[in-house]
């Protein structure tokens, strides 16, 4: 039982280190790719039919905090809920925390 606990703790530590290194990599985006101080319009779209998109958007209202991320994965505690497209056509990952 102690061995299982130790292995689980090591696995969680390895996952946390990997997540932190991915976040650091995402934070090192060149300056020209960083959004400026000007306001930017973002379009949020959900894959699937209109009904599922409506249901997904209703489930996000008031219960989630969402962020458009450049990283390939969402951060700890977030889940991938769709995509964001800026005015230039760049696609980002919509990550929501409940």
Curated annotation (Swiss-Prot):
GO annotation (BP), single: disruption of plasma membrane integrity in another organism
Protein's UniProt keywords contain Secreted: yes
GO molecular function, one term: phospholipid binding
Alphabetical keyword list: Antibiotic, Antimicrobial, Defensin, Disulfide bond, Secreted, Signal
GO cellular component: extracellular space
Intrachain disulfide bonds: 66-96, 68-84, 74-95
Main location: secreted
Signal sequence range: 1-19
Prodomain residues: 20-63
Subcellular location: Secreted
Matching Pfam families: Defensin_1, Defensin_propep
InterPro entries per the UniProt record, alphabetical: Alpha-defensin (IPR016327), Alpha-defensin_C (IPR006081), Alpha-defensin_N (IPR002366)
Tissues in which the protein is found: Paneth cells of the small bowel.
PANTHER family attached to this UniProt entry: ALPHA-DEFENSIN 1
Purpose: Has broad-spectrum antimicrobial properties. The antimicrobial activity decreases in the present of salt in vitro. Binds anionic phospholipids, which leads to the aggregation of liposomes in vitro. Membrane permeabilization of the target cells is an essential part of the peptide's mode of antimicrobial activity. No hemolytic activity against sheep or horse erythrocytes.
Assigned protein family: Belongs to the alpha-defensin family.
This protein's name: Alpha-defensin 1
Gene, per the UniProt record: DEFA1
């Amino acid at each position: 039982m102690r061995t299982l606990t130790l292995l689980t703790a090591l696995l969680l530590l390895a996952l946390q280190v990997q997540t932190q290194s991915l976040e650091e990599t995402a934070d090192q985006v060149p300056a020209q790719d960083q959004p400026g101080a000007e306001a930017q319009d973002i379009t949020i779209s959900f894959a699937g039919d209109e009904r599922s998109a409506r249901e997904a958007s209703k489930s996000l209202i008031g219960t989630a905090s969402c962020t458009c991320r450049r990283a390939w994965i969402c951060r700890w505690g977030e889940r991938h809920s769709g995509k964001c497209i800026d005015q230039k056509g760049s696609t980002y990952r919509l990550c929501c925390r409940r």
